[in-house]
Amino acid sequence: MNKKSLPLMALRDMVVFPGVIAPIFVGRKKSLQALSRTTISEENNSKYILVTLQKKFDQENPSKHELYNTAILAKIIQIVKLPNNTAKILIEAVARVKLSNIKDEEAFEANYEIIPDEEILDIHNMRSLVDNAVQLFSKYAMNDKKVNAEIIETINKEISNRTNFINIINILSSHLITSLETKQQLLEETNPVKRITTVITTLTSNIVNSETEHALQQRVRKQIEKTQRDYYLHEQMKAIQKELDEDKSELADIEKKIKSLKLSKEAKEKAESEFKKLRAMNQMSAESGVTRNYLETLLSLPWGKYDNSKIDINQAEKILNRDHFGLEKVKERIIEYLAVLQRSSKIRGPILCLIGPPGVGKTSLVKSIAEGMGRKYTKFSLGGVRDEAEIRGHRKTYLGSMPGKILGQLKKIKTSNPVMLLDEIDKMSSDFRGDPASALLEVLDPEQNSHFVDHYLEVEYDLSNVVFIATANSHDLPRALSDRMEKIYISGYVEEEKLQIAKNYLVPKQFKMHKIKEDEITISEAAILDLIRYYTKESGVRALEREICALTRKALKQILANKTVKHISIDSNNLEEFLGAKKYNFGLAEKEDQIGSTTGLAYTEVGGELLTIEALAFSGKGEIKTTGKLGDVMKESAMAAYSCFRSRATNFGLKYDNYKDFDIHIHVPAGAIPKDGPSAGCALFTTIVSLMTKIPVHRTVAMTGEITLRGNVLPIGGLKEKLLAASRGGIKTVLIPEENVKDLKDIPPNIKENLEIISVSNIDQVLKHALVEMPINKGLSYDL
């Protein structure tokens, strides 16, 4: 053939080798165009076409750069047109060719040049390699039933000639189970020895994989047969046991427990009734399993089992002081509680509820109380509980039913008088499954919990000997539940307390945990102070402990990595080398006095926070807008502050002339954090006055307190936490409601020394201390 250019067809999923006849389904537009452009050769009255593999399988319309240059010159033996504008062709690969000058138009077209195979120099060696490959292929064909018998027959016919090694290699290559890339490499390889070597390697791998798969199938089949055999024998054993009445031994154990346990009268009658039903049932029935589970649960509870606890308030006080620094008032109330129990265990004291921010030691206090009482400790976390069945249990008629967590904890620790922590009691919620807070009322009421009935047991269980202690972060508890508990407030730690806790508790704890020797690492007091000030911002010490843990890990890594380092000393100078840049600013208030910007004080679940309140005025309709994700209470405080300002505008030298011509926008930054509460009135009022009179607010002054429309300042809560936040934030003066002066006795002396605390009773006093100067009555209208 003298043609130098032919239509070119791209193949998705096959590589054709010379001498091989292969069917091809044609459906893509370019491929059909290429097929239609084939012409009959003058030499042998046949049609020819070029075929090559595309580089990416999922390419619907590959470009000429996405085709391999080594292709096949193929003779078209047959064309069969199919429905949906597709066709099936049968081709015979004539020769391997090198493509050039590929044209990418409606159809591919390319020039070609035939690539001959290299000469076989060692015929004897080649014959050995081919024989080896054919034997391997025969073995593979025996293992893999997918190989067509006609292929084996074709190979055997070629082998009989013993001369056309190239044809044998091509046939074997076309039927290898390997990647398209590997087959393309085989096509491109002109050295017959290298090609047959690759074929042998691939066939060997295929045989190993086939044998492994076959062995795995055999193993799975044997396992299935064994499982079926075991099941059959197990069922036979059950039938034999039924005939021999061997189940009687298990029933006898249940009956023995019913008689020996100190069950209540009601529980014993219920157990005997259920046992009679169980004995009369078919032991293979589903109802039998339900009854058996019920009896096992009922009899596994610690009926009449109590720890011999002996309360010694002196020892309890030592334990509390050993495990906790500070918290004097809290410890005092706990000792009073234990003193009452020591004198008379029959007195039903109140349920304690420890309320405070995270990390202040609520959970560890409860553990210390349990140790001081000589009782076991157990914990029931209520965070996220929204199903009352978690408390009361599910009725046994339900599939997979079980008792509630209260009895579940007693079953676990095997005593009826533990100290039980009800953790995160403020995090419960209710939905269509009921209200768990209402279910807790019976548990926490001393008049009712001696007759607690779990839905699963359906008999009374005495919880009056359990010491329940709850913890919460927020005061926001259901009224009925709150009424049954005595709330003990645990405020955040001051800097000095955190320092002592870190030195005496946290650092030794981390050194012990990480197996640090005393002479390996030292952390200076200055470094701990910097940790508290610049790497944590919390009321508790949980984050401080994490930072100390990170510090210990990094120092230990240096010691182990560098054998010459025997001791590491950490102080404020090299602290950043271990923990990186400082995370927070400490003692930095605003740099300048601002107009329309005031610092308020907030009390959140995690302690006190500084709250910046800012405002702007602009042309509008006389409306007031609030942003910053404010709650309803805070929005109403803003409205009240604005109304109070309007009523006193003439006192500040402003007229009523143009209020309807502008809007006031009040914003509290950190808009992603919800903010609410009745203590921002003073700050809101001061912000508005500063904005309208253009008088700056002292940058070192913060304030807290709600106001009335008449300008009176109302008391607030969380005073200690707010003063701690002011001290951390570099505030010098704090304005507090006059009615909160009585709470100053609970404030640590060092906080009161660092702050100038001024009590105020009305907004005039607030403005006197907050503004740079008092507004003068000039009788002017506000000018934008």
Swiss-Prot record:
Compartments, as annotated in UniProt:
Cytoplasm
Q: Which Pfam families match?
A: AAA (PF00004), Lon_C (PF05362), Lon_lid (PF22667), LON_substr_bdg (PF02190)
Has keyword Plastid?
no
Domain (Lon proteolytic) spans: 592-773
GO cellular component terms attached to this protein's record: cytoplasm
Q: Which reaction does it catalyse?
A: Hydrolysis of proteins in presence of ATP
Q: Mention one GO biological process in which this protein takes part, according to its record.
A: protein quality control for misfolded or incompletely synthesized proteins
Q: What class of enzyme is it?
A: hydrolase
Task: Specify which residues bind ATP according to the UniProt entry for this protein.
Answer: G356, P357, P358, G359, V360, G361, K362, T363
Q: What is its main location?
A: cytoplasm
Matching entries from Gene3D superfamilies are given as:
1.10.8.60, 1.20.5.5270, 1.20.58.1480, 3.30.230.10, LON domain-like (2.30.130.40), P-loop containing nucleotide triphosphate hydrolases (3.40.50.300)
Residues at the catalytic site: S679, K722
Q: What is its EC number?
A: 3.4.21.53
Keywords attached to this entry = ATP-binding, Cytoplasm, Hydrolase, Nucleotide-binding, Protease, Serine protease, Stress response
* Oligomer status and interactors: Homohexamer. Organized in a ring with a central cavity.
- Tell me its family: Belongs to the peptidase S16 family.
Q: What's the stated role of this polypeptide?
A: ATP-dependent serine protease that mediates the selective degradation of mutant and abnormal proteins as well as certain short-lived regulatory proteins. Required for cellular homeostasis and for survival from DNA damage and developmental changes induced by stress. Degrades polypeptides processively to yield small peptide fragments that are 5 to 10 amino acids long. Binds to DNA in a double-stranded, site-specific manner.
Q: What is this protein called?
A: Lon protease
Species: Rickettsia prowazekii (strain Madrid E)
